[in-house]
Regions:
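Transmembrane helix-loop junctions in multi-pass membrane proteins
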Residues: 2, 69-70, 82, 141-163, ...
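Extracellular loop-to-transmembrane helix junctions
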Residues: 2-19, 76-107, 116, 174-184, ...
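Membrane-interface loop-to-helix entry segments
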Residues: 16-30, 134, 171-215, 225-272, ...
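Membrane-interface "cap" regions at the ends of multi-pass membrane proteins
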Residues: 16-70, 256, 292, 296
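Flexible loop linkers connecting adjacent transmembrane helices
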Residues: 23-49, 72-75, 85, 89, ...
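Membrane-helix boundary/coupling elements in multi-pass transport proteins
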Residues: 67-74, 91-99, 103, 107-111, ...
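Extracellular/periplasmic helix-exit of transmembrane alpha-helices
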Residues: 101, 270-284, 337-372
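Loop-to-transmembrane helix boundary motifs in multi-pass membrane proteins
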Residues: 125-140, 334-340, 385-387, 416-452
């Protein structure tokens, strides 16, 4: 099948869903353009910052469009491209966009409270503590993985200490990324003091992007993975503590232009070349490497269809910058359906890169996607080196924009975990743990530790934890909508399905890890071998976290069900 046809069908479905279902949700729940948002009421120059709607959209999209939509869609294609396409469209429209929009809506209607604080208000303090602990652990895993991914992308040296073939490309992309950070601060200061909006801020963004690439192409930084890892963690520390307007928002605004260029380049490549989808339509309900289609397909696709992490961005940062409630639809629902389109494009690029017999191209999903789009740019007459640097930068930016967002969210989750109502008079250890800089340091230290002891051992749990997080958010939205007298029937189908998917995946993972440990012990211990210890560490860590996630998830679901059962519509509670 022609990949262009697939992309066009997806684009029509997603745009139609935004115009019809998204607007229906907005009308059903109630949008008040005249209401003062938390960004206006609680403006503090750090987290609560009134911001133009499209700038908030850029922040939301660039924060949620991380590694997931590309990696997940391509990996899940092992079951065939049709199941992936169907789940991305159905999941994005009725699951992911509803969750993101709902989380943003609930937060804005509650003074910009994060999801943890919303759970305390509508479910209880115990549920809040459990949820915040779950979120903090989840953020640590994401920080470790994405930081390692970024450092590996810019790495110029191989395992033998020699320069790799792509050293100049990687070094140039690294320098471009650093210049992005520098120009983002300059951009933020210009916006703050000169109040640039509309076409003026867009022109400035493009100028700074061009300057970043000019500097990067001429002055590449050749460093190893360890050095880039330190640089990455230093950057995300500042991104987590500095005011949103100074670094995070302007960088997201600039990055969005790159994402748009990447997506447009991929689409134009599909239009001009209209390559055939070489991946098989359907390979069966079981895959030798991944397992059974249910629940693995849903967990693997992850962010391209639905993601709990998105709700943390919606309620943790975006809700504190929305200036007008009418912007919530495009920020919450619109950013998610655009990410679903990115997942479809990634699937089609991988399909175009596959061999005629359906064999997937060599390399990681990111490498497959990067090479595919870079080849389109070269076909348009762009220089090979520039195309490679641009796509390497895009790949790293996908991870970096999610990384700095999750670092801030992890810091906030940690602070909320130990905070009390009267923090102004808090003393001792509680005041220290809730300090912005100290809580950020501990959060990043946890993520950094995971990169050193082997985050890869627990990364397989990311998909399940991410989807479970979305189910917990949906459960909270059910209670919120009921208490405030709003319709919540559209929440039940995705909630029930995601609970079934995530707990099944976690139990399957738990059983697999127990078998791996016991089988290794049965073979190696009698033979006097010492390799069992390594197997136990790798799988034991996953086992502990899987049990912890299941216990936390079940407890939160129990408290949510109890709160929903006891909740009554209170006309005074409507916000």
């Amino acid at each position: 099948m022609n990949t262009l046809v697939i992309v066009l069908i997806a684009a029509v479905c997603l745009f139609g869903a935004y115009m019809l279902y998204g607007r229906w949700l907005a009308n059903k729940w109630g949008i008040d353009p005249s209401a003062k948002t938390p960004a206006v009421v609680h403006e503090d120059g750090r987290d609560y910052v009134p911001t133009d709607g499209w700038t908030v959209f850029a922040h939301q999209f660039s924060s949620i469009a991380g590694a997931g939509p590309v990696t997940g869609a391509i990996q899940a294609a092992a079951f065939g491209w049709l199941p992936v396409l169907l789940w991305v469209l159905l999941g994005g429209i009725f699951f992911g966009a509803v969750t993101d929009f709902g989380a943003l809506y609930a937060s804005v209607k509650n003074d910009g409270k994060s999801m943890g604080m919303l759970i305390e208000k509508y479910i209880g303090k115990t549920g809040r503590k459990l949820f915040l602990l779950f979120c903090w652990l989840f953020c640590g895993i994401v920080i470790a993985a994405f930081a390692d991914m970024v450092a590996g992308t810019f790495n110029a040296y191989g395992a033998d200490g020699a320069l790799v073939e792509a050293a100049q490309t990687n070094g140039a992309a690294g320098m471009v990324s650093i210049m992005f950070m520098v120009f983002a601060v300059v951009f933020g200061l210009l916006q703050k003091n000169l109040h640039f909006t509309g076409w003026k801020e867009n022109v400035i963004s493009i100028v700074f992007i061009v300057l970043s690439f000019v500097v990067g192409a001429n002055f590449p930084i050749i460093l190893g993975k360890a050095a880039w890892s330190y640089i990455t963690f230093v950057y995300i520390f500042f991104a987590a503590v500095l005011p949103m307007w100074l670094l995070k928002q302007p960088r997201d605004h600039m990055t969005t232009f790159m994402f748009v260029a990447m997506i447009v380049g991929a689409v134009l490549g599909l239009i001009v070349n209209h390559p055939v989808m070489n991946l098989p339509v359907f390979t069966g309900f079981t895959n030798a490497k991944l397992g059974t289609m249910f629940p693995i397909l849903f967990v693997t696709v992850a962010c391209g269809a639905v993601s709990g992490f998105h709700s943390l961005v919606s309620s943790g940062t975006s809700s504190k910058t929305v200036t007008n409630e009418k912007d919530m639809l495009k920020v919450g629902y619109g950013a998610m359906v655009l990410e679903s389109l990115l997942a479809v494009i990634a699937l089609c690029v991988a399909g175009a890169s596959a061999a005629a017999d359906g064999t997937t191209a060599d390399g990681t999903p990111f490498q497959i996607f990067s090479r595919g789009v870079a080849s389109f740019f070269v076909g348009f007459g762009l220089d090979q080196h520039f195309a490679s640097v641009f796509m390497t930068m895009c790949v790293s930016a996908l991870a970096l924009t999610s990384l700095d967002a999750v670092a801030r969210i992890g810091r906030m989750s940690f602070q909320e975990l130990f905070s009390v109502d009267d923090m102004e008079h808090a003393e001792g250890w509680r005041k220290l743990l809730c300090n912005v800089y100290f809580s950020t340091f501990l959060t990043l230290a946890f993520g950094f530790l995971l990169t050193k002891i082997g985050y890869a051992n627990i990364w397989p749990l990311f998909g399940s934890a991410n989807q479970l997080l979305s189910a917990l958010v949906l459960a909270t939205l059910c209670v919120f909508l009921k208490v405030t007298g709003r319709s919540n029937k559209m929440i039940f189908p995705p909630l029930i399905i995601m609970l079934c998917v995530t707990f099944t995946a976690l139990v399957q993972r738990l059983i697999a890890m127990v078998k791996a440990i016991s089988n290794a012990a049965a073979v190696t211990i009698p033979a006097g071998e010492t390799t069992w210890g390594a197997v136990f560490i790798a799988n034991g860590l996953q086992l502990i976290l899987a049990v912890l996630l299941i216990v936390l998830g079940l407890n939160i679901v129990f408290h949510s069900f109890k709160a929903y059962k006891n909740a009554e519509h209170n006309s005074e509670a409507k916000v």
